[in-house]
Curated annotation (Swiss-Prot):
<feature type="binding site">
    <location>
        <begin position="824"/>
        <end position="828"/>
    </location>
    <ligand>
        <name>3'-phosphoadenylyl sulfate</name>
    </ligand>
</feature>
<feature type="active site" description="For sulfotransferase activity">
    <location>
        <position position="605"/>
    </location>
</feature>
<feature type="topological domain" description="Cytoplasmic">
    <location>
        <begin position="1"/>
        <end position="13"/>
    </location>
</feature>
<feature type="topological domain" description="Lumenal">
    <location>
        <begin position="35"/>
        <end position="873"/>
    </location>
</feature>
<dbReference type="GO" id="GO:0019213">
    <property type="term" value="F:deacetylase activity"/>
</dbReference>
<keyword id="KW-0511">Multifunctional enzyme</keyword>
<keyword id="KW-0735">Signal-anchor</keyword>
<keyword id="KW-0808">Transferase</keyword>
<dbReference type="InterPro" id="IPR021930">
    <property type="entry name" value="Heparan_SO4_deacetylase_dom"/>
</dbReference>
<dbReference type="Pfam" id="PF00685">
    <property type="entry name" value="Sulfotransfer_1"/>
</dbReference>
<feature type="glycosylation site" description="N-linked (GlcNAc...) asparagine">
    <location>
        <position position="392"/>
    </location>
</feature>
<dbReference type="GO" id="GO:0050119">
    <property type="term" value="F:N-acetylglucosamine deacetylase activity"/>
</dbReference>
<feature type="region of interest" description="Heparan sulfate N-deacetylase 3">
    <location>
        <begin position="36"/>
        <end position="589"/>
    </location>
</feature>
<keyword id="KW-0812">Transmembrane</keyword>
<keyword id="KW-1133">Transmembrane helix</keyword>
<dbReference type="Pfam" id="PF25119">
    <property type="entry name" value="HSNSD_N"/>
</dbReference>
<feature type="transmembrane region" description="Helical; Signal-anchor for type II membrane protein">
    <location>
        <begin position="14"/>
        <end position="34"/>
    </location>
</feature>
Amino acid sequence: MSFIMKPHRHFQRTLILLATFCMVSIIISAYYLYSGYKQESEVSGRASEVDCGDLQHIPSRLMEVRRTMISDASRTDPTVLVFVESQYSSLGQDIIMMLESIRFHYHTEIAPGKGDLPALTDNVKGKYVLIIYENILKYINMDSWNRSLLDKYCIEYGVGIIGFHKTSEKNLQSFQFRGFPFSISGNLAVKDCCINPHSPLLRVTKSSKLDRGSLPGTDWTVFQINHSTYQPVIFAKVKTPENLSPPISKHAFYATIIHDLGLHDGIQRVLFGNNLNFWLHKLIFIDAISFLSGKRLTLSLDRYILVDIDDIFVGKEGTRMNTNDVKALLDTQNLLRTQITNFTFNLGFSGKFYHTGTEEEDEGDDCLLGSVDEFWWFPHMWSHMQPHLFHNESSLIEQMILNKKFALEHGIPTDMGYAVSPHHSGVYPVHVQLYEAWKKVWNIKITSTEEYPHLKPARYRRGFIHKNIMVLPRQTCGLFTHTIFYKEYPGGPRELDKSIHGGELFFTVVLNPISIFMTHLSNYGNDRLGLYTFVNLANFVQTWTNLRLQTLPPAQLAHKYFELFPDQKDPLWQNPCDDKRHRDIWSKEKTCDRLPKFLVIGPQKTGTTALCLFLIMHPSILSNSPSPKSFEEVQFFNRNNYHRGIDWYMDFFPVPSNVTTDFLFEKSANYFHSEDAPKRAASLVPKAKIITILIDPSDRAYSWYQHQRSHEDPAALKFSFYEVISAGPNAPWELRTLQKRCLVPGWYANHIERWLVYFPPFQLLIIDGQHLRTTPATVMDEVQKFLGVSPHYNYSEALTFDSHKGFWCQLLEEGKTKCLGKSKGRKYPPMDSDSRAFLSSYYRDHNVELSKLLHRLGQPLPSWLRQELQKVR
């Protein structure tokens, strides 16, 4: 019995030991599992509630975390889709302003509360490289169908999302984001921000010291995170945490921007807890665009800065530089060279005013000239006169020769090739005499202005090249001739400091790869605000950004500018009378009244010459004088004539006797299919009416071929019409050129759509060419009504049909007629059937598109188009 009991006790003891071992194992496993979970939570917790001093010691795991796919350049267009609350919402406008400033392409849509998203793809290519929501709640609360479509697009094309949280009520808020593993607390005031040095977003932005002080606004949102996919970017302390549930600490730092690494659902996002009023948010916004677009939308870190000091030797007594000021200028130049590679002040002089100050200021003049080799120099005008006030070139040349003589006498270099006009007069709007005189006296190749295309908004300033002189955009820095004393700065000294420390001046440098700053002699005397401004600006840029500041001489700077922006080489002329500042620096001898009120744009061989003849019969309608070089047509907007400038263009038009009732116009039939003409015309004459004539494109093509034969075009004489229109891609160059001139103008819908990009439909009249040929009086009544010209002219009594010519002519006194010249209305064989069939097929799709366009515009279909569409059926 005892023998049987012993094994039984052994067995019990073994079971107890096994059970105990299992329990201990479970407890240990649970402990470590819990510890692991807790550690993971602590990483996220530290990410949302940290001591800024400990940021350097955030676990390196945050840097090594796996990230989702970034946009593939070949699969998406480099365009940003921006969902705004409304067309006029403040934050939406700020977002657009930033995108425009850094010259990124964007498309805006009103964020849909309900309804469909805009098309996100074009065939298999994504239309957008990045999506921005002014209000991220519009994305969060989107209906499931559209949300799934958008998320699928983002995942498939590697597209990220930037969103801003906007608090909707004034009371404190705290809630969980639907479908996301984090919560927010809103409507808070915050202070003392710092940057996470480990954030992969940082590119322009440099993680720096703690920025103490209150941040603008009391509507901040902070993020509380409980998932490792979120990484904080900027932290701040909360100033007003009372009455929040759950409560948050006053002493801890909370994330105001978070980066969703995409581990949760495969989409990377950057979420902002406030708008762009805070300067660090703007910097991170730029970096977020760069990172989420896979650096397709990114800024170089190189910044080129040139500081011009205008008006050297100019100024009233008491506003000029003395010897100590000049020494301070030299010392500061050396100091700035430690932060801005090759930094050199660029001095613009007007020699007439040398030694016109106090005794101390005259000594300052001499000290400047004694240090002439330490600076770069450029000429102003001798007497600081505005060039547009000189109406002849010889007077300008005399002034420039005096200034050059002064320079040679005092050892000032004269070979920099750069000049600036007082008040930017004559640079834009262009005063041709200035450009010619500059080249003859100084061999000027570079200048700058703040006026092209307009002074404001500054983000639209651009460069251009005219008369082989490169014109660069110039920037203001808040210093003008009257800003001499720090305490008397307009709006108070804090306004200047605010501009330097994350304000307008700071972002001028951040957003522009090249900045030429305008300052004045008076800014370097007295309180030396010029030195104060640029020393503090360089310090701030170096502290908070990774930008590489450097200076280049003007010639190198200009070449660098047009390497970066080759599309800006061609100018885009505008009406000087539409901008008061432009009127003030434009010659009083010139008038905008000589610009046309309407344009006849073609296309060729549709009856534009006949229309022109009929138009000038009207007593209130005046045409341009004929051009001797381009078959009477001016051809300004579509050819190199455009680079001659608007003075050249306006010289073709008479001065109207009555600006209100007289209508100037020009007819250039090549405008119709020109790539450049619509944009150029809209810029110079945006209110001009546009008239085009359409005939069957097959007939137009054949007429052009016969026209070229009559002018002995070798290709037209050598090849039949069918050979021309059916030529393949490997045909001889001259044959392909003739083919293009025959066929391309007949793509009517394409060309009209291009004009409609720049002109509203009510400014466009489309004439049926067949009606013009058969019932011109009726058509001319329609034209008069469209133009709004008076008095009404009775074309029924003024036109008569000439059976010999085969078209309508002007009826003169005593029964005589005035018809078009011999080159018009030629008789030639009818088109062969093969060519007719080929062209009918070739233009089929184009004609269908034209019918859709005319239907959209509410215009009737021409009779020839109705006939062609019947063939489609």
